């Protein structure tokens, strides 16, 4: 008797329920060996005051099955709500987001008939973590966190993916010409790990020119690895130029759990009209079937889907008079795929997945390097003061006894404004005061707390503290522009 794999299903919001019904219909007709557990997430939970969009009962189902197929959800805009996608990815430690983009030319309209690439996006870190603060009346902050171990995991995964899938090149995208620490470590780790895979070509682009090349010459790319926010943006670019965002599915992979979803959003403006393309979620389901070792069913469905595309049965988003035979709705598209189960495409590449898929694993143990000598050399204290000039703050601070520190610079938004030859006025209530240790002084954390107490007594409103360290003598902090 065939073994059935338990799968958690989330219908989502907007067009989610109708495309999920279409996909489940195809899975049933293809006799996928799965047992479904349905959970409620997204908008219905948000209105019940679940700020994360998911309940404890839903978590229990995901933890029980280990695999979730999720339709798009709607995250309410504005404060008070957290993205469910980000919450699931981070909670389940789904560190790798895999997003293939393939052209189905001439059956779908595209300027790039040879497009065939995969974007591997880091899934847990970066600005996408959503760590944000309002610090003053005027200033808002979003924190970008990148770890060496996070870089190592995703970059090694990308090279292993290239090896496993007979890819020839891995391209890294970053902005390390500006963000020399966060994006800098991503690029540095890429260069280190690339040396371990001499059979795979490697290259690096700055994200802006890399995105431009992706939009105009996508055929030059094979596998792209990048950080979270960049990956989110460029994967939509790749999906769009392939013919339709509605065709792209994605996998979110961790050590113990996996989530599969369409790349596109919930599109509430077309919900309930039976016009949405279910292909993105269907392709995600195909990736899920491969992941759980049902490559035979994945092959059956993908070949039927490609034959449907070849035969011109197209939803509105990809319909064109040159290669489309009939404009079909969501339900009819699913029915057309089912009619072609057992058939194979004639021009598009035929799918042929192995029955049992070996999980992509790494024997590497990721550890934090603590061998570098870490030395406290100063502190950046951010203050909230509505003054016309940094000189006003400097005049006030320099009248105080600041112990083992000396005030080196005052900056705003990364631009040094003191000391300068002239009093430069700027509109700001958010200032960074850089205090460095006096010559010959070995700083302790107690020195910083004393400094904060001194500032507080002087009615200087400190709003944030960033301590400055050297690691093996190298500065672990950036300089302000002009410093």
Curated annotation (Swiss-Prot):
Mg(2+) binds at residue 232. Its EC number is 1.1.1.42. NADP(+) binds at residues 74, 264-270, 277. It catalyses: D-threo-isocitrate + NADP(+) = 2-oxoglutarate + CO2 + NADPH. Pfam families: Iso_dh (PF00180), Isocitrate_DH_C_bact (PF18324). D-threo-isocitrate binds at residues 83, 85, 89, 99, 121. SMART domains: Iso_dh. It comes from the Bacteria. The keyword Cytoplasm does not apply. The keyword Magnesium applies. GO terms for molecular function: isocitrate dehydrogenase (NAD+) activity; isocitrate dehydrogenase (NADP+) activity; magnesium ion binding; NAD binding. Its cofactor is Mg(2+); Mn(2+). Binds 1 Mg(2+) or Mn(2+) ion per subunit. It is an enzyme of class 1 (oxidoreductase). Keywords: Glyoxylate bypass, Magnesium, Manganese, Metal-binding, NADP, Oxidoreductase, Tricarboxylic acid cycle. One of its GO terms (biological process) is tricarboxylic acid cycle. The record marks 128, 175 as: Critical for catalysis. Homodimer. Catalyzes the oxidative decarboxylation of isocitrate to 2-oxoglutarate and carbon dioxide with the concomitant reduction of NADP(+). Belongs to the isocitrate and isopropylmalate dehydrogenases family. This is Isocitrate dehydrogenase [NADP]. The gene is icd.
């Amino acid at each position: 008797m065939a073994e059935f794999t338990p799968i958690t299903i989330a219908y989502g919001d907007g067009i989610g329920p109708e495309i999920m019904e279409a996909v489940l219909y195809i899975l049933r007709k293809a006799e996928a060996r799965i047992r479904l557990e349905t959970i409620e997430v997204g908008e219905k939970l948000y209105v019940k005051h679940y700020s994360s969009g998911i309940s404890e009962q839903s978590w229990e189902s995901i933890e029980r099955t280990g695999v979730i197929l999720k339709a798009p959800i709607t995250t309410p805009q504005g404060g008070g709500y957290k993205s469910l996608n980000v919450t699931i990815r981070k909670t389940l430690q789904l560190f790798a987001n895999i997003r293939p983009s393939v052209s189905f030319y001439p059956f779908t309209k595209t300027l790039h008939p040879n497009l065939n690439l995969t974007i591997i996006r880091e899934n847990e870190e970066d600005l996408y973590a959503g760590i944000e603060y309002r610090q003053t009346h005027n200033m808002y902050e979003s924190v970008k966190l990148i770890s060496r171990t996070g870089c190592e995991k995703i970059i090694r995964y990308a090279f292993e993916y290239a090896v496993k899938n007979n890819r020839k090149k891995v391209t890294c995208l970053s902005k390390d010409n500006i963000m020399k620490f966060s994006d800098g470590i991503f690029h540095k780790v890429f260069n280190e790990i690339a040396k371990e895979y001499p059979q795979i070509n490697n290259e690096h682009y700055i994200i802006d020119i890399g995105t431009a090349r992706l939009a105009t010459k996508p055929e030059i790319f094979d596998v792209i690895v990048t950080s979270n926010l960049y990956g989110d943006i460029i994967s939509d670019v790749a999906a769009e130029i392939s013919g339709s965002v509605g065709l792209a599915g994605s996998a979110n992979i961790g050590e113990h759990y996996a989530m599969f979803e369409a790349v596109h959003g919930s599109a509430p403006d077309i919900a309930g009209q039976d016009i949405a393309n279910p292909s993105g979620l269907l392709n995600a389901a195909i990736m899920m079937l491969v992941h759980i070792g049902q490559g035979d069913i994945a092959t059956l469905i993908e070949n039927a889907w490609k034959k449907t595309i070849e035969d011109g049965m197209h939803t509105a988003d990809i319909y064109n008079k040159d290669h489309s035979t009939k404009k079909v709705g969501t339900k009819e598209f699913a029915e057309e795929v089912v009619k072609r189960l057992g058939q194979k495409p004639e021009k598009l590449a035929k799918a042929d997945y192995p029955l049992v898929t070996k999980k992509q694993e790494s024997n590497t143990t990721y550890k934090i390097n603590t061998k570098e000598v870490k030395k406290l050399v100063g502190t950046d204290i951010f203050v909230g003061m509505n003054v016309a000039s940094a000189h006003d703050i400097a005049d006030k601070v320099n009248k105080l006894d600041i112990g083992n520190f000396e005030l080196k610079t005052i900056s705003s938004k990364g631009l040094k404004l003191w000391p300068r030859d002239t009093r430069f006025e700027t509109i700001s209530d958010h200032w960074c005061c850089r205090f460095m240790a006096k010559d010959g002084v070995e700083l302790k954390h107690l020195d910083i707390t004393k400094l904060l107490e001194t500032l507080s007594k002087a009615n200087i409103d400190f709003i944030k503290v960033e301590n400055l360290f050297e690691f093996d003598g190298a500065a672990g902090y950036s300089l302000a522009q002009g410093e």
